[in-house]
From Swiss-Prot:
Disulfide bonds: none annotated. It comes from the Bacteria. Gene3D superfamilies: Ribosomal protein L17. SUPFAM superfamilies: Prokaryotic ribosomal protein L17. One of its GO terms (molecular function) is structural constituent of ribosome. One of its GO terms (biological process) is translation. The keyword Ribosomal protein applies. Belongs to the bacterial ribosomal protein bL17 family. Keywords: Ribonucleoprotein, Ribosomal protein. This is Large ribosomal subunit protein bL17. Part of the 50S ribosomal subunit. Contacts protein L32.
Amino acid sequence: MRHRCNVPQLGRPADQRKALLRSLTTEIIRNGTVTTTKARAKAVRSEVERMVTLAKDGSLAARRQALGYIYDKQLVHLLFEQAPERYAKRQGGYTRILRTVRRRGDNAEMAIIELT
């Protein structure tokens, strides 16, 4: 039972939710920006921040953790090369969520999440 677990459910079972967050994280790191729903953007923000923090650490253990989470191996190597100098003076807050127009079909709140 999930008593008082504050995990955003996103209307999916746990395995599908984990796969969704992994794929969104991979695409944000690859493209720098993704348009998605506001709830998904808020949920994926912590995962992206965690991956950038691992990349700033740069250790072998951190690299292996990132390889286990991000789907693209070359993307992990690129992240570990670029993140330490790009975010050297920043202690978190690597992403930004911008609200945008609602989705036409179901009027869902949409947002753009991007790396800063």
